[in-house]
Amino acid sequence: MSKMMVFTGNANPDLARRVVRQLHIPLGDVSVGKFSDGEISVEINENVRGKDVFLIQPTCAPTNDNLMELVVMADAFRRSSATRITAVIPYFGYARQDRRPRSARVAISAKVVADMLTVVGVNRVLTVDLHADQIQGFFDIPVDNIYGSPVLVDDIEDQRFENLMIVSPDIGGVVRARAVAKSLGVDLAIIDKRRPKANQSEVMHIIGDVEGRTCVLVDDMVDTAGTLGHAAKALKEHGAAKVIAYCTHPVLSGRAIENIEKSVLDELVVTNTIPLSAAAQACGRIRQLDIAPVVAEAMRRISNEESISAMFR
């Protein structure tokens, strides 16, 4: 642990401070700012030669600024002779374009970001709940994708919900929701979204009996909260007594707060992989959990060459 040093950019300094408190080490001294024309400026204010450096920087909004901060920081530490550089990216932005749909002329931006990080000297990446697990394969360096579910499950248990049922908001999230349901020993329901015909509104079919149940929607992220709002409405229409959503990443873009306040969702519980905006903090239906202990433990294990997978057995 003596060679371990932790630094952060401007994306989520509060999370970085929480992580170093868990590790009982100081936060490293680096100046990350901008030149007058908007270019990213990085200067390391202490010796990092021979050190095991961890850079905590989610690539959340403003996505491009935060990504460039991470890239320029990594280059600065490589040129300053750090032995190993681990990019700790609690929320991995640019993850939604992870494949090229047939006949579509689009970029695979997740691969572009992976290449950028590798080129500037990042030796290892630590992420939380990647939007798509296959993104790990875009990297030519080791990637540890840890799960936020233990933090969510612990809170669900603490709430002592009556007649609890876990719900996947779509078919793609079934594996995640099933794992949470299995961990809690409760039933699982699935929302199957279908569009009967072109230009017709989406119809939500509920697979499972939610009548009188406390339904907990589980997803990796909440963006505009439109899907969660529609899911909560469908569940209430099918007799659910209460609907709470648990999501690891609070992206909360666009009209998300307005959508949450207008919805029948009783509560939205998120982690601090992304800092909440002032509007989100003021929303009485949003509650934030601390994921720093899980991130800190993963970082400790990486630094000590211990197993990461053992954390989730």
UniProtKB/Swiss-Prot annotation:
Keywords from the UniProt entry: ATP-binding, Cytoplasm, Kinase, Magnesium, Metal-binding, Nucleotide biosynthesis, Nucleotide-binding, Transferase
GO biological process, alphabetically ordered: 5-phosphoribose 1-diphosphate biosynthetic process; purine nucleotide biosynthetic process; ribonucleoside monophosphate biosynthetic process
Keyword Phosphoprotein included in the entry's annotation: no
Residues that bind Mg(2+) 2: D170
Binding site for Mg(2+) 1: H131
GO terms of molecular function: ATP binding; kinase activity; magnesium ion binding; ribose phosphate diphosphokinase activity
Pfam families for the chain: Pribosyl_synth, Pribosyltran_N
The record's free-text note on cofactor binding: Binds 2 Mg(2+) ions per subunit.
Major site of localization recorded for this protein: cytoplasm
Domain of life: Bacteria
Pathway field: Metabolic intermediate biosynthesis; 5-phospho-alpha-D-ribose 1-diphosphate biosynthesis; 5-phospho-alpha-D-ribose 1-diphosphate from D-ribose 5-phosphate (route I): step 1/1
Enzyme Commission designation: 2.7.6.1
UniProt key word NADP: no
Ranges in a coiled coil: none
Reactions the enzyme catalyzes: D-ribose 5-phosphate + ATP = 5-phospho-alpha-D-ribose 1-diphosphate + AMP + H(+)
Active site: K193
UniProt: ATP binding residues: D37, G38, E39, R96, Q97
Subcellular location: Cytoplasm
Residues that coordinate or bind D-ribose 5-phosphate: R195, D219, D223, T224, A225, G226, T227
Similarity annotation: Belongs to the ribose-phosphate pyrophosphokinase family. Class I subfamily.
Subunit structure: Homohexamer.
Record's function text: Involved in the biosynthesis of the central metabolite phospho-alpha-D-ribosyl-1-pyrophosphate (PRPP) via the transfer of pyrophosphoryl group from ATP to 1-hydroxyl of ribose-5-phosphate (Rib-5-P).
Name this polypeptide is given: Ribose-phosphate pyrophosphokinase
Species: Pseudomonas aeruginosa (strain ATCC 15692 / DSM 22644 / CIP 104116 / JCM 14847 / LMG 12228 / 1C / PRS 101 / PAO1)
Name of the gene encoding the protein in the UniProt record: prs
